[in-house]
């Protein structure tokens, strides 16, 4: 019995070691946005205002198909956090609504605050930011799905351009402290670039160098960008350029997250229906490029002026009314749930994204501009259902099968043809 017990004991020890090794390997593979689990072609987040978001809002966000919400966390300094938001409580509220949090850690455009008096005597701003960021990560690792370090450091609003070298030092300090304290969340992205890094020279070299160093040290798992632009379709080529630049720098494991992007509806520039078209296409082109995470800016309009761009990025009005962008996107999400990308092309000025859901192929068709006739090739005997999302959702027949398929007019307002047996 002793011999048998010893053998069993050794076997159990080996089994335990193997389990630890396998778990460690699984965890390592799971790091980064590539490991995000989602019910949709792209995991979708929406930006919220920590000071005004209600529990009813959070529940409605989840019911609409969003899986994440993004908000900034700032240190307890009046210059950058005048309301002294209770962030731990907000994180709990987000979790209670069955949403995941994207938390952007930001210290102020002087790295620590915005005024000289924010920096206490003898303290280094780099250390103060690192202490704050690492401490907050450590306290909430289990409750936050995605951490983002900084927000648009290539924009003077969020980083004083005179402090580029200091930012590089602050990033290095943060990574060193994370390693020293063994703080290693599954997803840490940076830095929420306003411009496309490594392409075109719009991002200062110090910021690019800081990112590469942080990614190579396994401090940052992914890069985060804010690809604002007049029309969404041009983002596809930019994603490819960025991917190539990351690979060139031996950052093949570094993923791409879109941590902020949206369109405002404001007079006389853009109607609510045009905003809805652009927001919808923003999601589609992100899915087409295989990007795993998109944060839409924003949940609710900031103000009530019809002529202010900054007041009108929401998919909900300031008064809480659903805008056309909300309706179109959320109706699409209901259909696209549990679907995966099959293919994408933009031949002859028509964008075609094909998704597969169960036994159905979902062909989403649109153009960046004028209408174009398009035919979806379909073998005889297949059924086709057409879904329009604008100005409201309508299901109907695709019409008769002609020229080996079903025809539609593609426009700036996407239409979906669902092909099934």
Q: Which residues are covered by each model-predicted region?
A:
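Bacterial N-terminal signal peptides that target proteins for export
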Residues: 2-15
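Bacterial N-terminal signal peptides
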Residues: 13-24
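N-terminal substrate-binding region of glycoside hydrolase catalytic domains
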Residues: 31-135, 144-154
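Short, well-ordered coil/turn segments that N-cap beta-strands
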Residues: 39-42, 65-67, 97-101, 141-145, ...
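Active-site cleft segment of glycoside hydrolase catalytic domains centered on the general acid/base Glu
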Residues: 53, 82-85, 113-220, 226-245, ...
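Aromatic/acidic polysaccharide-binding cleft in carbohydrate-active enzymes
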Residues: 267-329, 345
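C-terminal beta-strand-rich structural cap/linker in extracellular carbohydrate-active enzymes
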Residues: 397-421
């Amino acid at each position: 019995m002793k011999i048998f017990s010893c053998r069993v004991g050794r076997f159990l020890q080996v089994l335990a070691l193997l389990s630890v090794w396998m778990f460690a390997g699984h965890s390592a593979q799971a790091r980064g946005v590539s490991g995000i689990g989602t019910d949709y072609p792209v995991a979708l987040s929406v930006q919220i205002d920590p000071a005004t978001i209600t529990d009813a809002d959070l529940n409605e966000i989840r019911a609409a198909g969003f899986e994440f919400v993004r908000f900034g966390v700032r240190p307890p300094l009046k210059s950058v956090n005048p309301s002294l938001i209770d962030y731990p409580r907000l994180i709990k509220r987000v979790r209670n609504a069955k949403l995941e949090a994207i938390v952007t850690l930001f210290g102020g455009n002087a790295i620590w605050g915005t005024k000289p008096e924010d920096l206490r005597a003898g303290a280094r701003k780099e250390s103060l930011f690192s202490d704050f960021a690492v401490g907050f990560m450590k306290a909430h690792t289990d409750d936050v799905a995605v951490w983002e370090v900084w927000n648009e450091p290539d924009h003077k609003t969020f980083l004083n351009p005179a402090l580029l070298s200091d930012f590089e030092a602050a990033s290095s300090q943060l990574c060193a402290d994370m390693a020293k304290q063994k703080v290693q969340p599954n997803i840490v992205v940076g830095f929420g670039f306003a411009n496309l890094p490594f392409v075109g020279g719009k991002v200062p070299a110090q910021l690019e160098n800081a990112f590469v160093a942080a990614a190579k040290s396994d401090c940052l798992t992914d890069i985060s960008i804010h690809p604002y632009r007049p029309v969404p379709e041009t983002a596809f080529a930019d994603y490819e350029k960025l991917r190539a630049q990351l690979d060139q720098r031996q950052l093949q494991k570094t993923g791409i997250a879109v941590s902020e992007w949206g369109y405002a509806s404001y007079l006389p520039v853009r109607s609510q229906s045009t905003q809805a078209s652009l927001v919808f296409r923003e999601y589609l082109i992100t899915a087409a490029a295989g990007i795993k995470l998109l944060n839409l800016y924003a949940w609710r309009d900031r103000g009530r002026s019809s002529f202010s761009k900054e007041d009108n990025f929401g998919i909900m009005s300031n008064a809480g009314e659903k805008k056309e962008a909300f309706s179109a996107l959320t109706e699409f999400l209901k259909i696209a749930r549990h679907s995966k990308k099959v293919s994408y092309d933009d031949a002859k000025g028509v964008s075609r994204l094909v998704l597969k859901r169960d036994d159905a192929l979902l062909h989403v068709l649109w153009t960046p501009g004028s209408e174009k006739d398009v035919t979806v090739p379909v073998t005889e005997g297949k059924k086709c259902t057409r879904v329009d999302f604008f100005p409201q959702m309508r299901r109907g027949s695709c019409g008769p099968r002609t020229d080996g398929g079903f025809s539609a007019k593609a426009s700036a307002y996407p239409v979906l043809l669902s092909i099934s047996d």
